[in-house]
Amino acid sequence: MANLYVIKIGGNIIDDSAKLDAFLQSFAAVDGKKILVHGGGKLATRMAEKLGVEQQLVDGRRITDAETLKIVTMVYAGYINKNIVATLQANHCNAMGLCGADGDAILAHKRNHPVLDYGYVGDVDAINADLLTVLLEK
């Protein structure tokens, strides 16, 4: 596939609505096929605090227990993802939001650490390129 761009944005952009809007306008203007991968910044932590779910971070990495997994899924795959899709659509960039579980887009295994159990945190094993190719070609 010619001209496929895969761009990952992190919390620095996600947490700043002006930066996010400016980035998404620029991203929408890029010609060619593109995939945007995003995290959730501090929003998941703030939501967990509002819901009374204590968060554990070790060296900036989240320890994800069952309740935190629900919140992270809600925030990342729900609110943030759909906000990004809506903003891209408003900028005339046809967009679709997926999470890694959708269509087995991302296959992963539980993160193995010699001392620390990160809970429901995983490391990527494979990307379902066939699925992404079908979606990008439509």
Regions found by a protein language model. Give the residues of each.
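Nucleotide/pyrophosphate-binding catalytic subdomain
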Residues: 1-138
